A protein has these predicted regions:
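N-terminal nucleophile
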Residues: 1-377
Length: 377
């Protein structure tokens, strides 16, 4: 029988002022009801346009009637819902998202400035220091402008219509500039950064405001399960800013079985591949730094990394997948639970901030039995 198993932790990290608070007991797997054989699981920001993501998805669930043919059809239906009047966000919440982006844009600029000329910020009465300060600000604004201008943009967003949306919603970077740059700043700096902000809004650069939803299960015409993950920033000017994430599957040869991760990519990669992605980057960078004058060095480094991947795939990854292919659905569910447990243990041992933890929810989906929860909070 074909099917899939899904597991998720239930920890959330909530921002309270400038601090972060860890909270347990948050379900991240959302089920639409008995008529549909799919679920949506969530990672990233807990809100979309300042609306809790659970409420947003539940509002969409209520609009679903008969089951759809494919998982892709469910994804398309959700995107269409987000831009409809049935979606719970408002013009005010669209404006709040833009204000948050403006604040973030200026804050990043401030952090970069502090690293360069932060040592003179308390002595700007000195004309030479004031000149250095202003020059550094303008240089940073130009760098931000060049960076955001070259990034890929969300569908339906260009410089002209994005600027119009920002104007219509009465948003600017001015209040953030006054807050983060109380020492003062030249008018040219503000003008360039305001222009950079237009491209920031239109661009696909990831931010802490982004949510990630993975749709997994079966449509009525699908024999085999499917999973699709989309990155969501929110609705701005009545248009949804979203981007499909196609690089979220670790698959066996022949693509008969795979692991789709909604979050914690590096950990999931290391469990399956045998080492963290950072190891590949380190090997690649070490080779290129050792012999930078060699014209073929980049090609050599790439070949070494590909060789590592091939060896581990042949000796470790594919045999593991072949064994997993013989699991029953209940055994597959236990395996997904254990994968999350491994990441919880890794997070505890790392000494870094807790980003995964709490009770684990897990379930299976197949064409005969539909959604069967193994554990649900």
């Amino acid at each position: 029988m074909t099917g899939l198993a899904i597991a998720s932790d239930t920890l959330a990290t909530l921002k309270v002022g400038s601090a972060f608070k860890v909270s347990h007991g948050h379900s991240k797997i959302f089920s639409p009801g008995e008529d549909h054989q799919f679920v949506v699981y969530h990672s990233g920001s807990s809100a979309l346009n300042n609306v809790p993501i659970r409420l947003h998805v539940d509002a969409w669930f209520r609009t679903l009637t008969k089951p759809l043919t494919t998982i892709d059809a469910y994804v398309a239906n959700y995107k269409k819902f987000c831009e409809s009047t049935k979606a719970p966000q408002t013009k005010a919440s669209e404006r709040e998202l833009l204000l948050a982006l403006a604040d973030d844009t200026v804050q990043i600029c401030r952090e970069n400035i502090d690293r360069v000329v932060g040592h003179i910020k308390d002595n700007l009465d000195n004309p030479e220091n004031k000149k250095l300060w202003n020059e550094a600000l303008i240089k940073e604004a130009k760098a931000a402008f060049d960076f955001y201008k070259e990034l890929p943009r969300f569908d339906g967003f260009n410089e002209t219509n994005t600027k119009d949306i920002i104007t219509q919603l009465k948003v600017s970077v001015n209040s953030a500039l006054r807050f983060y740059f109380r020492e003062g700043y030249p008018a040219r700096f503000a003008s360039i950064l305001a222009h950079a902000f237009v491209f920031r809004v239109a661009s696909k650069v990831e931010s802490s405001f982004d949510s990630y939803l993975t749709f997994s299960g079966f449509g009525t015409k699908e024999i085999y399960p499917a999973s699709r993950r989309i990155n969501l920033r929110g609705v701005i000017g009545g248009k949804l800013q979203s981007d499909p994430d196609n690089d979220v599957t670790i698959e066996s040869e022949g693509k008969g079985l795979g692991i789709v991760y909604g979050a914690q990519f590096d950990a999931m990669y290391s469990v399956i591949q045998g080492y963290r992605k950072i190891v590949e980057h380190h090997v690649h960078n070490t080779i290129t730094a050792t012999m930078p004058e060699l014209p073929e060095i980049q090609e050599l480094a790439n070949d070494v990394v590909k060789g590592m991947q091939t060896i581990t795939a042949k000796d470790y990854v594919n045999p593991a997948f072949r064994r997993m292919a013989n699991f029953s659905l209940s055994e597959l569910a236990e395996t997904t639970r254990d994968l999350v447990n491994l990441q919880i243990l890794s997070a505890k041992l790392s000494g870094s901030s807790e980003t995964v933890g709490g009770e684990i929810e897990y379930l299976t989906i197949d064409k005969v039995n539909g959604i069967r929860w193994q554990n649900r909070i």
